[in-house]
Amino acid sequence: MRRSLLPALALAGAALLLAGCTSAPSAAEATTVPSSAPSSPTPTPTPTVEPRIVVSLDGIAVTDETGTRDAAFDDPDAVLDLLEETTGQLPEPEKVETLPGYDFSFVNYTWDGLWVLTDTEHERAASAAITGASVGGVPITTEEGLSVGSTRAELLDAGAWALDDAEDPATAEFLGLGGREAPGTESLSRPGSTGIVYTLFWFDGDTVKQVQVPANDYSDL
């Protein structure tokens, strides 16, 4: 059954009549609606920076919430100081057997996941070998983002090459990546050509087990 609209219309008419009989409020009687307080802006959350260690041909860089700090391999003391600051420890140097043809000796500083090789007096450039996926709990990679545990397929996609032209990169035990000329040197594998420095990857099957930086093709060290 439909409801009649008459009662509602009647009420509406009465309301209009009452409104017409009521005088308009004076300005003093006008109701003031309080303005709402301005809302405080929502603070932007500070981005979280994941600590990481990156090893390049030139040296080591550490990034964390305080920023990025780096040290060049040409300054072994700076490299060791940076790693001590990052990991909270500086291992005792381990003497390396003197190599034939060299009139100076070498020492290794070995962390779990990394070792740094330099001469005893720290007068010559250092080099590093990545032996684990992290050092002191901090992930460590090359500047390409590769690390211990990376696959051969990832290296080949990045442009890695076999050290010997006679080897197949798909099966070679060692692969090189990158390459930058070292003026004043001569390549041992490419006589007559300027030597290069590069990143060396050592494989166990198809998985990287060690990364050496910087490697070169002009010395037998």
Predicted regions and their residues:
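C-terminal motif of bacterial Sec signal peptides marking the signal peptidase cleavage site
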Residues: 17-20
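Bacterial N-terminal signal peptides that target proteins for export
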Residues: 1-11
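Short helix/turn-capping signatures at newly exposed starts of structured segments
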Residues: 22-171, 195-221
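Surface-exposed intrinsically disordered loops and tails
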Residues: 175-191
